[in-house]
Amino acid sequence: MQTILITGASSGFGRDIAETLAAQGHRVFAGVREIGGRNAEVSAQLKAKGATPVGLDVTEDASVDAAVRQVLGASGGQLDVLVNNAGIASAGVSESFTPDQVRDLFEVNVFGVQRLLRAALPTFRKQGSGLVITIGSILGRVTFPFFGLYGASKFALEGMIDSYAYELSQFGVEFVLVQPSAYPTNMYASVQRPADAGRAGEYGEIGAIPGKMFETLMGMFNGPNAPNPHDVAEAVAKLMATPAGERPDRVVVGTAFGADAANAAFAPIQQQVVDGLGLRSLGQVKVKAAV
């Protein structure tokens, strides 16, 4: 049994991951915003499935720190796995998003991950072990027009998590990026749209493309061959079952759109960079000996 903290567990991938891992007998703490408010019913449902709901808003330092303290207090100071899942999506003409909208996007998708890592890593370093699974996207490797700002936040995670993996390898902490394709979750139902519709209107026919893309995507999600979002929970469970030191640094889930090829092509280049810096030893995680 492992102790796991999952962010963004009120719906979508996060909720499915929480329920899947709890069913496997793990001690799961499901991070949920407004746990006693609009998500009270969801919290009760998670609890019924064997997970422990924890109030957690990744955009607030105090909330993140309190959630990690609660987990450590309830588990006797143990935390084995952190799943960075909380995220929001955006779609539209990039110029028509305001700076405040982009800031909100990065606040959740990037800064939220940094908050969780700062809160959890001291425990992982002290233990000499830990696994951080971050839900990225294939759009952190390839670019879809009109999804560029969302993609930018996921590209940021790629560099961020790579650096953390090197820096924490000798402390026995592993990092894996899960890169899902498009799946029917409520993240798309609540996708961030441009606040400056007038600016988007200046693009004419091109400005109408994202709406058509979105309609096509929704049609695919509602069709008989819609991709199964449970694929992501299964990928996370498989990573957890893989022995320490043998996990891949990236896993593409669903239709790759070339992201898998990009991963394979970039890996030797990155290795050359690290070798050139004389830091090859940081590329291999130091696995804690079994007691």
Describe each region flagged by the PLM.
Residues S10-S11:
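Conserved glycine-rich cofactor-binding loop
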Residues Q170-R247:
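SDR active-site lid
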Residues L56-R69, P99:
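The beta1-alpha1 cofactor-binding region of Rossmann-like NAD(H)/NADP(H)-dependent oxidoreductases
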Residues S137:
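Residue(s) in the substrate-gating loop at a strand-loop-helix junction
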Residues Q24-A40:
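Conserved glycine-rich Rossmann-like NAD(P)H-binding loop of the short-chain dehydrogenase/reductase
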Residues L117, S153:
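Active-site helix of classical SDR
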Residues V93-S94, Q101-R103:
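Substrate-binding pocket helix/loop in short-chain dehydrogenase/reductase
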